[in-house]
Amino acid sequence: MSTPNQHAGKVIITCAVTGAIHTPSMSPHLPVTPEEIIVDSLAAAEAGAAILHLHARHPDGRPDQSPEGFAAFLPRIKQGTDSVVNITTGGSPYMSVAERTAPAATYQPELASLNMGSMNFGLYPMLNRYTEFTYDWERAHLEGSRDLVFRNSFKDIEYVLETCYGNGTRFEFESYDTSHLYNLAHFADRGLVKAPFFVQSVFGLLGGIGSHPEDVMHMKRTADRLFGSDLRWSVLGAG
């Protein structure tokens, strides 16, 4: 006879509708245009996604972190669903922190993602699976990650917090390794972030922690120890 899980509760499903990692040649189903992002966002909400994690793209699929890029789809998504809108401040590793933060600062969403530490960000292994690309930028985007550090310094994180917290925006703290959890604890100790802490543990991206079950348990144990009952834990497996 099984014992009921005393910690069971409602589960929050987040849909990252288009992201910034994958490129158009990888799937004809990747939303690129504003209309595609709108349609897929509303469909995700209808299917049960309580949070819509939103990025924007240029017409050729390149990541677009301009406020104007988000303006093309945000109003209709907000009007069409009551799901929580989460605007990325991660954007793309190739962008400055000011560029990455601009949409969240402009539109003041309920939720914004916030990467909690610098890291190598290896996308180039995907070149082993894809050899033909529709756009020239795609191969360079992936190949360039061999020599790419995704910068999220303490100063960068402070910039995002200082820019957005006063607008009422809460954060999804993107943590790609246990060091990122300790960085979050550091900001909590300084009073720059407040509980509860919505932690997104990201597994399987080259440069961060792996995706073995032991890795997952290690991240969860560390987060539990650091944040206790103030933790709201979420899991993302890199595709």
Residue ranges and their predicted role:
Residues 113-239:
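Catalytic alpha/beta core domains of metabolic enzymes, predominantly
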Residues 15, 63-87, 160, 164, ...:
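Alpha-helix-loop-beta-strand connector modules within alpha/beta enzyme cores
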Residues 25, 50-72, 202-207:
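Glycine-rich, proline-tolerant flexible connector loops at the mouths of alpha/beta enzymes
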Residues 7-13, 48-50, 79-85, 108-110, ...:
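Short, well-ordered coil/turn segments that N-cap beta-strands
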Residues 3-29, 131-137:
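N-terminal small/glycine-rich loop or linker at the start of catalytic domains
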Residues 17-38, 89-97, 146-151, 172, ...:
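Active-site mouth loops of central-metabolism enzymes
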